[in-house]
Amino acid sequence: MGPRGTAHSVRAPLSWLLLLLLSLQVAVPAGALAETLLDAPRARGASSNPPSPASVVAPGTTPFEESRLPVFTLDYPHVQIPFEITLWILLASLAKIGFHLYHKLPTIVPESCLLIMVGLLLGGIIFGVDEKSPPAMKTDVFFLYLLPPIVLDAGYFMPTRPFFENFGTIFWYAVVGTLWNSIGIGVSLFGICQIEAFGLSDITLLQNLLFGSLISAVDPVAVLAVFENIHVNEQLYILVFGESLLNDAVTVVLYNLFKSFCQMKTIQTVDVFAGIANFFVVGIGGVLIGILLGFIAAFTTRFTHNIRVIEPLFVFLYSYLSYITAEMFHLSGIMAITACAMTMNKYVEENVSQKSYTTIKYFMKMLSSVSETLIFIFMGVSTVGKNHEWNWAFVCFTLAFCLIWRALGVFVLTQVINWFRTIPLTFKDQFIIAYGGLRGAICFALVFLLPATVFPRKKLFITAAIVVIFFTVFILGITIRPLVEFLDVKRSNKKQQAVSEEIHCRFFDHVKTGIEDVCGHWGHNFWRDKFKKFDDKYLRKLLIRENQPKSSIVSLYKKLEIKHAIEMAETGMISTVPSFASLNDCREEKIRKLTPGEMDEIREILSRNLYQIRQRTLSYNRHNLTADTSERQAKEILIRRRHSLRESLRKDNSSNRERRASTSTSRYLSLPKNTKLPEKLQKKKKVSNADGNSSDSDPDVGTTVLNLQPRTRRFLPDQFSKKASQAYKMEWKNEVDVGSVRVPPSVSPAPRSKDGGTQTPGLLRQPLLSKDQRFGRGREDSLTEDVPPKPPPRLVRRASEPGNRKGRLGNEKP
């Protein structure tokens, strides 16, 4: 096949996919999306009861006529819903791949903006072909299926310590700030509606307050999609993200409260107090349900060590169960799934295996990425249609009031909260927090959820909400990166914390806790220390099993150590049987057993001070995971093990050499067995041992006597061997250099012969050793003057030095 055929085969799947998607939308005007998102129960009823083969009747025949077996059939309605859902997910994934093929595009335009543009393009194509409104996103589908994976991913990988350290500021912005924006926008819009020239007099105060509550919701999906790309510092990121996560619960509560007030004919004082009580019940109840199911999930994973396959399943089941349970009781599902995810991250992670933990991370990232992509695409698709009503005054003033009240709320509330913060928020931080108030899918879903019977101007609310969403996502989302660079806002530090830094941080935590305890101040350090003690004493013992799973690196290290111990025992390097002499001196000692309290204390000390294998995720990223540090840890552990093996082998070899190479047992290997040494050498050996420093006790003496290192083997003539030894005896510091030959001061240099040799060898000494060998140990100083005329032996067993790893034979290199 030529190049043209190859290119055609590559382009064919994409073209067929687009043609198939468009043909399905044209052939089925209602669309599976309409049945799935707009009329899901009817679609489920139709798909769950397919026509049986017996009831299928061919066209043009009566029920009594016999039908023949067809060769090829097409039953698209039977697979319509899952088929189109698969195509939409595939299209969204291909769109994300296409965006990231050009690396500079996601840095200029956020991914959420590109996905909305794709949705607008598809919605325009569907609207132009069918001349009908494209299928809109049903709110139940958004709240029950698309939103939970995103919130679960955000809560599971949220840095818990910065979140709780800034919890007061986050709660202040989320609760008081949302009330500020909702009431301010609602009252301001009601004032605009009182102007008769705008034609908005039919919109009441409660309807404006309801619209203000839903339009003031800062969306975590939009915030994550934008803020993860600009890499602001961790404190600023956690403030904006935490506010967007918590104010959703406040927004939903206010939305339901004002919606109920709008449907009432008369509002009494009891209803107002009931609404305030409902506000606290919804938020606190959702948190309690999430924590409870998180504890149950951790307790369940204590018993999954024999069935590792189902460990990731419990994480997703319990988290989704917390969300739908909270929604069933009309509590905050977002708060429930966030609390459940943070609880499971602390306890479930300790029980599951490393492979299960990796599966949980990747599957959670995949679900959140797909859900986020579908949300933004459906926002673009649902925008195109006929369900809009335009009013310049209402739309423009809504956008202006959203920006004004957001900025005023951040600046006013920050001035109050800075009185209680150790590190106050600067003007740049306040500006970025106000600028990062992005609206998104939650506002879009809530405005579509309004009943048309109670709100006759629903289309106007939809149009105004879409304008605010598109302005914040496109204009603010695109310009926030250059604005952060222009203001020189502190960025996040991607450098991983070193061990010394972590130790010092823990040390300062304990110091600050002690200072707060002495001063009687109950700060966050005090409460963190109290919770840690309670956690170690009760919760961890109940929720985490004792034999915690270890990393594969630890398992490998354990196997290597066991193998090394077995090899040492088999080769006899470790003697497990004591000698009879040692048994005579052995005293029976009773070993006291440790109490359970002492064992717990030892475990606590080891758990605090030992090297931790699994590293926690310090920074959050939407689509990518942090680099795995197992390779670096494996390298570090293997280096430590090799070092320990070298130390053990060095000690064993040195001790064996010391026992074998003592001065009393050393002999010349070149001589026959049982051959006695000359008397003078034996006297010299006795003198060296008589000094009280034998080679066994003092290695330097043994080395001086018998450490005959390799040297140039030149056999001296008999007539000047004695004089040459006298030259060796002289000290090197009294020598002078003559050319390349060292001559003692009392000896004049002899003339050289033609062949380069010396004419009077008795008056000149040529060193037989190199400079390094001569000045290394000073072995020649200990030789005697009377050397036998025989040449020195070639192979000699030398006395070993502790820690010296040189060879034992004389012909080895030093």
Swiss-Prot record:
GO MF terms, alphabetically ordered: sodium:proton antiporter activity
Swiss-Prot/TrEMBL catalytic activity: Na(+)(in) + H(+)(out) = Na(+)(out) + H(+)(in)
UniProt topology in membrane: Multi-pass membrane protein
UniProt-listed InterPro entries: Cation/H_exchanger_CPA1, Cation/H_exchanger_TM, NaH_exchanger, NHE-2/4, NHE_CaM-bd
Gene null: resulting phenotype: SLC9A2 null mice do not develop diarrhea, have no changes in quantitated intestinal Na(+) absorption, however mice develop a sharp reduction in the number of gastric parietal and zymogenic cells associated with a loss of net acid secretion in adult but not in juvenile mice. SLC9A2 null mice also exhibited reduced recovery from laser-induced ulceration of the stomach. Double-knockout of SLC9A2 and SLC9A3 are not significantly different than the SLC9A3-deficient alone in diarrhea, intestinal Na(+) absorption, or reduced life expectancy.
Chief subcellular location: membrane
Intracellular or extracellular location(s): Apical cell membrane
Annotated control of activity: In colonic crypts activated by low pHi, hyperosmolarity, and an increase in intracellular cAMP levels.
Comp. bias regions, Low complexity: 740-751
Tissue: Expressed in the colonic epithelium predominantly in the cryptal region. Maximally expressed in the luminal membrane near the crypt base and in the middle of the crypt (at protein level). Expressed in gastric epithelium (at protein level).
Gene3D superfamilies per the UniProt record, alphabetical: 6.10.140.1330, 6.10.250.1040, 6.10.250.2020
GO cellular component labels: apical plasma membrane; brush border
Disulfide feature: none
Pfam families in alphabetical order: Na_H_Exchanger (PF00999), NEXCaM_BD (PF16644)
GO biological process: epithelial cell differentiation; protein localization; regulation of intracellular pH; regulation of pH; sodium ion transport
PANTHER family for this protein: SODIUM/HYDROGEN EXCHANGER, SODIUM_HYDROGEN EXCHANGER 2
Assembly information from the UniProt record: Interacts with CHP1 and CHP2.
Protein name (Swiss-Prot/TrEMBL): Sodium/hydrogen exchanger 2
Taxonomic placement: Eukaryota, Metazoa, Chordata, Craniata, Vertebrata
